[in-house]
Regions:
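Heme-based O2/NO sensor domains and their adjacent alpha-helical segments
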Residues: 5-21, 34-117, 130
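Mature-region segments of soluble proteins
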Residues: 109-111, 122, 139-141
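Preference for long, well-ordered alpha-helical segments
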Residues: 125-144
Length: 144
């Protein structure tokens, strides 16, 4: 009896990338990922539609910024910094304490889409990243 391989849960949120040209390199490496994260959190502070998700974070966003940077580094095909420092991301488990509904997902995406528009000049890459971010954000919903 041949068993089919079981895919890990992380597959649901893994960004497909070419081994020879990962999204991490296409986006511009470490500094570009840091700029994207910084702009994302600036927008979370600025956009009225992001108030509810901003309220889910502590006043000091520095730890959240660093963790998102570490996660995105590996998720985009760069160094797996988050896993090296904190172990497996376990995104769903870590987000379960927060009420993430469609509105929260859409607010998060509004911040990320705008950050992508401002920070990623390649339209095809931007569209690929936006689609993958949406899948991940929707995967984290724990309420309708």
């Amino acid at each position: 009896v041949k068993q089919s391989p079981t895919l890990p849960l992380a597959t649901a949120v893994t960004l497909p990338a070419s081994v020879d040209n990962p999204h991490y390199r296409q986006i511009g490496g470490e500094q570009a990922v840091r700029r994207l994260v910084e702009r994302f959190y600036q927008l979370m502070d600025e956009l009225p539609e992001a108030r509810a998700i901003r309220a889910m974070h502590p006043p000091d966003l520095a730890p959240a910024k660093e963790k998102l940077f570490l996660f995105l580094s590996g998720w985009l095909g760069g160094p797996p910094l988050y896993a090296e420092r904190h172990g497996p991301p376990r995104l769903r488990q870590k987000h379960l304490p927060f009420p993430i509904d469609t509105a929260a997902r859409d607010a998060w995406m509004a911040c990320m889409n705008r950050a992508l528009e401002e920070q990623v000049s390649n339209a095809d890459l931007r569209a690929q990243l936006a689609a993958s971010f949406f899948k991940t954000a929707d995967f984290l919903r724990n309420q309708p």
